[in-house]
């Protein structure tokens, strides 16, 4: 793990840890169908501008606490990296969450945490909220910000804004898939 000694590194770690981004969509499909989509991590690469591939490790398709999957991400600058994720919550049809492991592999000290919350609506649809929380573990954002401490605030803000935009785009794509499945009666698979 890279350490950032001194006040600049400490400040960067403080500013990155707890960084949060959220997005939300109303979907004209029931929570069960929406949950089945968000819990199928293999579909994320088709929806997200950043995540280009994900696959279950071990038993495929088992969205349950403790299950692991890999995610491959690509940033606008072309940098690609692969992460290992651990499912922390699989409460159909209400919530699905996971942590992204840093290089220590400790789920209690993740690089980031992701969570979908799915609320039923009176009309039979769903409100889907997605939340990203950074840290406290190591990440590429920490590394980039530490290399340019004078620009760290801007780098961190740009990442937060990029996350929000990417999360919104992914939710819109998932919404389209859910609403198509609901309208046609064909399952989300």
Where are these regions (language model features)?
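Hydrophobic ligand-binding cavity/cleft-lining segments
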Residues: 1-65, 189
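Conserved long hydrophobic alpha-helices within structured protein cores
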Residues: 1-2, 86-95, 126-137
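Intrinsic-disorder/low-complexity, polar/charged segments enriched in Ser/Thr/Lys/Arg/Asp/Glu/Gln
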Residues: 18-26, 31, 68, 82, ...
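A generic "alpha-helical surface" signal
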Residues: 25, 161-165
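Well-ordered beta-strand positions
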Residues: 26, 88-89, 119-120
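Active-site phosphate/pyrophosphate- and oxyanion-stabilizing loops and adjacent acidic/basic residues
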Residues: 42, 85, 116
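Glycine-rich portal/gate segments that line the openings of hydrophobic small-molecule binding cavities
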Residues: 56-113, 165-188
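Beta-strand/loop substructures that line and gate deep hydrophobic ligand-binding cavities in soluble
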Residues: 101-162
